[in-house]
Amino acid sequence: VNIGSDEIKDIVCGGINLEEGMRVAVSCPGAVVRWHGEGEPVVIKNSKLRGVESFGMICASDEIGLGELFPSETEGEILDLSAFDVPAGTSLANALDMNDVLLEIDNKSMTNRPDLWGHYGIAREIAALYNLPLAKIEPFRADVQSDFKVEIEDPDRCTRYIGVEMSGVAVKPAPYKMQNRIWKVGMRPINALVDITNYVMLATGNPTHAFDADNITDHIVVRHAGEGEKLLLLNDKELELNADDLVITDSEGAVALAGVMGGAKDLILPKTERVILEVANFEATGIRR
């Protein structure tokens, strides 16, 4: 294995997908990893494996804390970094653009400032305080024709609901730059459609969601839940709702808990070809509760 400056090291590896010329993550002696992503962290040492001296470890993604960003398709799969065109020996943090400084802001200190609940709002505040230029988000208007309808039964709890129907979509991974940014702030990349909604939510602080339109019956209604009404969420948790809960429904029942989480009925799947993108303004107190 070339680990930089044309330094070649013998490393014993049993990865099922390993092949010549593949770019991989190597932990050299002294590095700390989690063996197969489980148990206590271990320190890598020079060792003899299968009668061969091994000078490090070729890593799977979950062994170095990257399992959510680079999920393995099968057990025993090595992290394939061939898509990253960097010289051998480049630190993984530099190769994967992970040398960011993360600022953690406790939102309990600004619950009265919904304009600061997204990254752009924080940037705008900093620009105002320090008289700095602020990058502008250019508006975009699409000429979309659709028979899709939305009804809001409680305009006090939902002041605005925008739904855009799109067809002919293909469910693919989001660009790495978007996946990386989402992962850095504690969210798991899923696919381009879901990641886009989460990315926009993080940027603007505004709830967004994507529905599989083929699983929405008739039209969307924003209403209060019925007492004892059931909703199966996309994390497979079933909720028993009460009349204070605000839900997104179709003609058959609740499909999402407004501003919180979507339901299992209409989640985005690899076969999804038609979607409804939701952007809404929900009353904050109810969402927080």
Protein language model annotation of sequence segments:
Residues 1-140, 276:
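Phosphate-backbone binding interfaces of nucleic-acid-interacting proteins
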Residues 62-63, 71, 80-83, 171-172, ...:
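Conserved catalytic alpha/beta cores of large enzymes that bind or transform nucleotide phosphates
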